[in-house]
Amino acid sequence: MNWISNYVRPRINSIFSRRETPENLWSKCSECGTMLFHRELSDNLNVCTNCDHHMALTPRDRFTALFDNGIFTQITVPEPLTDPLKFRDQKKYPDRMKAARTATSEAEAMLVAEGEMGRTPIVAAAQDFSFMGGSMGMFVGNAIIAAAERAVALKRPLILFSAAGGARMQEGILSLMQMPRTTVAVQMLKEANLPYIVVLTHPTTGGVTASYAMLGDVHIAEPNALICFAGPRVIEQTIREKLPEGFQRAEYLLDHGMLDRVTHRARMRDELITITRMLMGQTPAVKGELPAPAPLESDAETALASDTDPNGAPPSKD
């Protein structure tokens, strides 16, 4: 009996029992269907290693990749009124907010931070599409205003990463009001002669595209990002025609003069450093090892003295 209980039963249990495996070890590429190991995907900045599809990236992950050594300071954003319209569809608006905060571990759909990028001080803002579709509400409006005011106060450029489905339905006209508010915030930067660079990521649509996302001094997009006001499906149903291949995608907009660059995520930081320093009138960033410093005058005199004999005669050329 002891042999059965001590050896056979544990052996059977070990064979038939399922190991508990974390659910987030693997991710499936939505473009090509390849299963990607989470660490491999994270090291590649959430870009598929098979088809180069750019997946969503959280604001904190973007800032970690953007700022020097991943170090940044989050800027506090004023909190707006909670559920001012008492909106309810299938769920109450506060319940949707609570679910989004639980799922993302973030307070709202935009994060604002400051730090250094290539030794250049900047202010950055990024939208989180996983938080209610990155929708533009009163908080997002407050965040952009806070970012612009901080940039003006410190005389720093502002870099914004957009990712949104448009205005937040649950806030109604108060959400649409953020379009002129954010436009005024961008104008503050222009009056202060500070660069405003927008990186459009997939997707950037609706009222976000119609306001602050297309008001930058430079517009850069990630590959194959959908950038539009009304989506292609809505347009096709309205005009009853099939749209061209790649319509409203980043490459299409670049060909038609709506964008300045389409840049791979892996090269985005270097691109932003170059453009930011150029617009700020700074010298190009030094890449690689810095050159050895020039010798000081006292060092040069010491070196000359070591090459001279005790009688003061110059060294022999033999």
Curated annotation (Swiss-Prot):
Pathway this chain belongs to: Lipid metabolism; malonyl-CoA biosynthesis; malonyl-CoA from acetyl-CoA: step 1/1
Subcellular location, principal: cytoplasm
Sorted UniProt keywords: ATP-binding, Cytoplasm, Fatty acid biosynthesis, Fatty acid metabolism, Lipid biosynthesis, Lipid metabolism, Metal-binding, Nucleotide-binding, Transferase, Zinc, Zinc-finger
Cofactor(s) for this UniProt protein: Zn(2+)
Cofactor binding note from Swiss-Prot or TrEMBL: Binds 1 zinc ion per subunit.
Residues the record lists as binding Zn(2+): C29, C32, C48, C51
Localization annotation: Cytoplasm
One of the protein's GO biological processes: fatty acid biosynthetic process
Superkingdom, taxonomy of origin: Bacteria
Xref: PROSITE patterns: COA_CT_NTER (PS50980)
Molecular function as annotated in GO: acetyl-CoA carboxylase activity; ATP binding; carboxyl- or carbamoyltransferase activity; zinc ion binding
InterPro entries noted in UniProt: AcCoA_carboxyl_beta (IPR034733), Acetyl_CoA_COase_Trfase_b_su (IPR000438), ClpP/crotonase-like_dom_sf (IPR029045), COA_CT_N (IPR011762), Znf-ACC (IPR041010)
Secretion signal span: none
EC number: 2.1.3.15
An annotated GO cellular component: acetate CoA-transferase complex
Catalytically driven reaction(s): N(6)-carboxybiotinyl-L-lysyl-[protein] + acetyl-CoA = N(6)-biotinyl-L-lysyl-[protein] + malonyl-CoA
Domain CoA carboxyltransferase N-terminal positions: 25-294
A Pfam family matched in the record: Zn_ribbon_ACC
Zinc finger (C4-type): 29-51
Subunit and partners: Acetyl-CoA carboxylase is a heterohexamer composed of biotin carboxyl carrier protein (AccB), biotin carboxylase (AccC) and two subunits each of ACCase subunit alpha (AccA) and ACCase subunit beta (AccD).
Family under the similarity heading: Belongs to the AccD/PCCB family.
Function description: Component of the acetyl coenzyme A carboxylase (ACC) complex. Biotin carboxylase (BC) catalyzes the carboxylation of biotin on its carrier protein (BCCP) and then the CO(2) group is transferred by the transcarboxylase to acetyl-CoA to form malonyl-CoA.
Name of the protein this chain belongs to: Acetyl-coenzyme A carboxylase carboxyl transferase subunit beta
